[in-house]
């Protein structure tokens, strides 16, 4: 890792982190004025970055991971900015698979803090996400990365990341999410996501239906060429012992690739990633077929369709909206149908609880309802009542913490059972930390 700052005025890591977390109270406040001003005061570190910008409802993180891994296999230095984190804040800001160090983080905060405090004095405080975005851009600039993978936080048009002019914009797929903020219709949400499209910058998109028309119209207005990805462009050819093989149709040739990321929908994510790097190739980047194949094979994404334990078999997936839960259920039906399924479910209360519950219950043999430590976590009794209202013959338990839920699941699981932890990334993050702690 590079060292970004060596300054006697650098504050201790914990003080820096506590200061940053104090801004979580501001929540999401849309608009680019604050992040633009903040970055200007910091010398506009984002303007020198070669960015791949990724938006969408589901699959953003996986696509970012695939592209980052491909570029690294080709010998490039790659920054990766993702959100939210699963276990540690440092997961959000990564260069070549190395999370930002405590020293670098504290040094960056020491630089950003005076600017932010001055903005607060003017009643113009940036949000938590805006500050983190500025930290990521600074870190990538200081470390002179060749490319920066930047994942949209929420929406697109007014997201803090939308100050970049990327080499390529990727929109994975679009379904209902954050409807209180983005709108109640897919078309409205698509319009927000399409806000990342820039004049003359190529777009790679996997959206369908109403969203496709909206994105196509915006791209046409901005003279941005679009590569559309649909299900005819990839086929799953095999699944064996946690590995999938896909045949993916690229712009120039077909690719046979393998991935340890689970779920048939990874075919779409891989097709999006390949289409994006093909755009970079058309812009002059040198990549070999092996770079693409080896990069996809090496990519991992903790907490998303992740097998974290073999005995007992435990699957973690941060599905937190109806579309994501449907993908999880399809994977359970297709690849784990011979196993009894013990589901540990913890969801945030501002999600579409009824649809999420009604989607996961049919595949479940036993359901253990719990909650994460996040203050937005739904009350388990509310989820229990929803399951009862479905009038299905399921065994349901309630535990007041994720460690207790995991211990309970392990006690009742049979040798060939699958334990599936899902409902939110906060639930999965706590579960992952606890399971790894036990294993170590």
Sequence positions of predicted segments:
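C-terminal helical cap/extension that packs against the catalytic core
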Residues: 208-218, 223, 313-316, 322, ...
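Beta-strand->loop->alpha-helix junctions that form or flank phosphate-binding loops
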Residues: 82-84, 205-207, 218-240, 259-264, ...
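Nucleotide phosphate-binding/pyrophosphate-handling subdomain across enzymes
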Residues: 48, 147-152, 159-170, 174-178, ...
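Charged, amphipathic alpha-helical linker segments immediately N-terminal to NTP-binding catalytic cores
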Residues: 1-26
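Short glycine/serine- and small hydrophobic-enriched flexible loop segments
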Residues: 138-141, 275-282, 433
């Amino acid at each position: 890792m590079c060292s970004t700052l060596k300054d006697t005025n650098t504050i201790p890591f914990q003080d820096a982190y506590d200061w940053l977390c104090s801004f979580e109270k501001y929540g999401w406040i849309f608009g680019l004025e604050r992040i633009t001003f903040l970055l200007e005061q910091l010398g506009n570190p984002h303007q020198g970055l070669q960015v791949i910008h990724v938006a969408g409802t589901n699959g953003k993180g996986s696509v970012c991971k695939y592209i980052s891994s491909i570029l690294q296999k080709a010998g490039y230095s790659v920054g990766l900015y993702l959100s939210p984190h699963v276990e540690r804040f440092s997961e959000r800001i990564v260069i070549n698979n190395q999370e930002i160090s405590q020293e670098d983080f504290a040094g960056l905060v020491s630089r950003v803090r005076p600017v932010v405090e001055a903005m607060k004095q003017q009643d113009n405080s940036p949000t938590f996400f805006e500050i983190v975005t500025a930290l990521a851009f600074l870190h990538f600039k200081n470390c002179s990365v060749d490319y920066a993978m930047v994942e949209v936080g929420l929406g697109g048009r007014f997201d803090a990341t939308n100050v970049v002019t990327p080499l390529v914009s990727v929109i994975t797929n679009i379904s209902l999410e954050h409807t209180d903020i983005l709108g109640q219709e897919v078309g409205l949400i698509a319009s927000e996501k399409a806000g990342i499209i820039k004049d003359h910058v190529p777009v790679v998109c996997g959206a369908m239906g109403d969203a496709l028309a909206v994105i196509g119209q915006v791209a046409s207005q901005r003279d941005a060429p679009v590569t559309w990805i649909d299900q005819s462009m990839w086929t799953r050819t095999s699944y064996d012992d946690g590995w999938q093989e896909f045949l993916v149709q690229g712009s120039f040739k077909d690719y046979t690739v393998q991935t340890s990321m689970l779920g048939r929908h990874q075919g779409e994510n891989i097709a999006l990633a390949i289409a994006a790097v093909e755009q970079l190739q058309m812009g002059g980047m040198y990549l070999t077929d092996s770079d693409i194949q080896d990069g996809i094979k090496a990519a991992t994404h903790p907490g998303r369709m992740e097998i974290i334990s073999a005995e007992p078999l435990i699957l973690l997936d941060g599905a937190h909206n109806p579309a994501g839960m449907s993908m999880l259920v399809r994977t359970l039906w297709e690849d784990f149908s011979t196993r009894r399924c013990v589901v540990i479910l913890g969801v945030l209360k501002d999600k579409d609880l009824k649809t999420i519950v009604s989607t996961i219950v049919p595949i479940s043999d036993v359901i253990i309802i719990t909650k994460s430590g996040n203050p937005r976590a739904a009350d388990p009794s509310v989820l229990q009542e929803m399951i009862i209202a479905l009038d299905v013959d399921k065994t349901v338990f309630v535990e007041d913490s994720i460690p207790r839920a995991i211990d309970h699941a392990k006690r009742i699981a049979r040798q060939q059972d699958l334990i599936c932890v899902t409902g939110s990334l906060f639930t999965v993050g706590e579960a992952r930390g606890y399971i790894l702690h036990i294993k170590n």
